[in-house]
Amino acid sequence: MVLHPRLARLVIAVSAGLLIGYACVWASVSPISIGRSDFTSTYVGATLFREGHGSQMYDASLQTQLHSQVIAPDHVGNLPFVDAPIAAAIAAPVTLLPLDAAYRVWGIFQLLTLVAAVILAVRSARWPKDNWTVWKVATALAAVAALGSLSMLMEAQWTGVNALGLALAYRDWRAGRLGRGAVWLVLFAGVAKPHLALGLVAFALGWRDRRIVQGAVLGAIGVAAVSVAIVGTGGIAGFVHLVALSSTQFAPSAFVGMYGLIGVILGSGAPGEILWLAGAVAACVIAWLAGAAVRSDRSRLEVGLTVAALATILATPHAYVHDLVLLAPMFVWAMADARVRDAASLGQTRRATVLVLACWLTLSIAELLSLAGGPLAAVLGGPIAAGAVVPEVLIAFAVVAAVVTLRGSRKQGVLPGAPRPRRTHGADLTLTLTEPGSS
């Protein structure tokens, strides 16, 4: 039995210290900073919905007028509300509060959704039979203590909802409830950030199970129906139009996916857009192959979903540091899988556990560099764009996870997309493999 409780306690201590520091930083946010946070766009969109302007919710001039009133006496340009219509309906109750109080309540709510996602992933993951609770606690704290959580809290952003949807999907897929898992994934992605499901949807399609497709379609129909009920068809058209307009409002180098990396290298323009599109398609294809590998060998679920989660961040054109909290459930099941591997290894080492922790630490350091300001930025010679440091780390992790996923399925004797094993007519129900081209 492999335990290594000292390492787990060290992880707990460091993670707890970081979380306390995050709380202190968040508590010190000034009213001016709150008015300039991403939450103001949610507040504006939800206020328009609450006041009966659902069909005009994506009118840029109407948003700008209300935004100026909300942040007065400060004067900054409008940050457009471009989240899905359901987001405005969910956030509407907090707009009964003043902006500052609503910001605090909403930040806590999003943090709680992230904590719920992590706890659900911990409870659903496959841990060693004799694993101590200390490792589950350490994993949960480390998942929440990544720098993306601080960024999400500071901006009162939505990505905790996406993480909860991913955790629910993982729980049901682990239990064989494939259709219900797909429903959760699509429903929660459709609340505010549907673009944070690109690689995950490709993974689900690669799995090629009728129940998953039916669940995804059912979830999409539900999201579409509720969205139309909230803003009408005209509001949906306005949503699409405003999203297209706002895509050029932000510097590409600020994003953490391939769009950010290409923005750092080529800047904005058609060549960069074409190169990003090719990279996004490649990331989704790799996620699809990971789904095909899991279809052939269900034990590859954790590492295959890791590929899909990373591919999602890399493929989307609009992902900031706070969107990296989508990877928190991924870290949990990766740690659980590492504990299983270490427990089964000769001599019961902790090599896999240390490797996963090192990867998570590396990503956190990249996040820190991209968020660096003040004295740290001076030491580094100026702020570092997120697109200059984070995408490379994500690409490296995705390549390693993809190799492990595809090699794992080949070791089982089945290539991704090959026919599934069939049962013989023998009483012992021995499984035989049907290779392509065999008679």
Regions found by a protein language model. Give the residues of each.
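Membrane-embedded alpha-helical segments of transport systems
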Residues: 191-195, 222-226, 362-366
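Transmembrane helices and adjacent periplasmic/lumenal helix-loop junctions
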Residues: 186-203, 316-323
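Repeat-unit-sized solenoid/scaffold elements
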Residues: 119, 123-124, 187, 403-407
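Aromatic-enriched
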Residues: 335-439
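Central hydrophobic cores of alpha-helical transmembrane segments
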Residues: 185-187, 216-222, 305-310, 350-362
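Hydrophobic transmembrane alpha-helices
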Residues: 98, 193-196, 330
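Alpha-helical transmembrane segments of multi-pass membrane proteins
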Residues: 147, 313, 333, 360-363
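Primarily membrane-embedded glycan-assembly and transfer machineries that use lipid-linked glycans
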Residues: 1-181, 204-324, 328, 337-339, ...
